[in-house]
């Protein structure tokens, strides 16, 4: 675990990839957002601000950044994020104790400093802040915890607050969704924070532009997060290169089987659904 900002990949290569994907995707559909996420925390990228600026020069498309918000106490991070149109920080707790239990932050991170960073960013930022709250059963779904979280959100004044739950296999077995009653309670208590409930399964397509091999495309997505088996099948079925470059006898099931037999992906059942994840990931429900 690191808390130091640096360039994990050459920023020029990242920018070229962004430019290429924008050109390909915009040729056949409208792009809603360019979103910076990352295999980890995007604000750890030292060149994030530069990448946002350069992306804005490429196309007039809104830019969003999905972040855990832990580094917003730093002025350089706030300056970088101020160039985005939407910033989506996480805030799963209203108290330091619950924050530590859920997020298990870097040892140097102080909860009050994290919240203060969010508040300072709100005061200076002209874009929209969409806070994401992950509800975990037995940790932050009680009335007391939700009211503590509400008081923090009142200071941050987000444009939207998205409530979600662990819908993919979590890293720890205790990270399970709350009961429906607890979700309803959260919707009610946090209602003044412009709540949007997204506790159902995600929808939408995964972009596979730039890949000439379907198995490489699936691996690239699964490395970021587990995929439901239906998502894997739909993604392979919708690949733009399927009709052009793949043999007539190409089989989606054979692709999945080859990846599994090679040890690159593995199957995991979670909440009565089959997920696929890379063999590198350690999940608490195995």
Task: Give the ranges of each region predicted by the language model.
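Canonical Radical SAM [4Fe-4S] cluster-binding loop centered on the CxxxCxxC motif
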Residues: 1-13
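Well-ordered alpha-helical segments embedded in enzymatic catalytic cores
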Residues: 13, 17-20, 113, 117, ...
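Short Fe-S-cluster ligation motifs
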Residues: 13-39, 198
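Alpha-helix termini
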Residues: 22-28, 122-124, 241
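Conserved AdoMet/S-adenosylmethionine-binding subsite of the radical SAM
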Residues: 43-185
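Auxiliary Fe-S-binding modules of radical SAM enzymes
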Residues: 141-286
């Amino acid at each position: 675990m690191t808390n130091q900002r640096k360039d994990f990949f050459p920023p020029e290569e990242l920018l070229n990839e962004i430019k290429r994907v924008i050109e390909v995707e915009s040729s056949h559909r409208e792009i809603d957002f360019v979103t910076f996420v990352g295999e980890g925390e995007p604000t750890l990228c030292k060149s994030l601000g530069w990448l946002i600026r350069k992306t804005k020069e490429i196309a007039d498309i809104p830019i969003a950044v999905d972040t855990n918000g832990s580094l917003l106490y730093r002025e350089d991070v706030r300056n970088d994020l101020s160039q985005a149109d939407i910033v989506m920080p996480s805030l799963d707790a209203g108290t330091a104790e619950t924050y530590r239990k859920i997020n298990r932050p870097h040892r140097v991170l102080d909860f009050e400093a994290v919240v203060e960073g969010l508040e300072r960013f709100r005061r200076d930022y002209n874009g929209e802040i969409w806070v994401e709250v992950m509800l975990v059963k037995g940790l932050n779904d009680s009335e007391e915890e939700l009211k503590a979280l509400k008081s923090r959100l009142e200071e941050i004044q987000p444009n939207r607050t998205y409530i979600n739950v662990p819908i993919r296999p979590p890293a720890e077995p205790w990270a399970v969704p709350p009961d429906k009653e607890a979700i309803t309670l959260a919707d009610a208590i946090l209602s003044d924070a412009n709540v949007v409930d997204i506790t159902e399964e995600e929808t939408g397509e995964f972009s596979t532009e730039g890949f000439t091999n379907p198995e490489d495309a699936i691996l690239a997505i699964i490395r970021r997060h587990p995929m439901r088996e239906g998502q894997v099948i739909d993604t392979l079925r919708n690949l733009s290169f399927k009709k052009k470059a793949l043999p007539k006898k190409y089989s989606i099931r054979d692709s999945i089987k080859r990846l599994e037999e090679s040890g690159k992906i593995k199957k995991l059942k979670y909440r009565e659904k089959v997920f696929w994840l890379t063999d590198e990931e350690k999940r608490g429900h195995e």
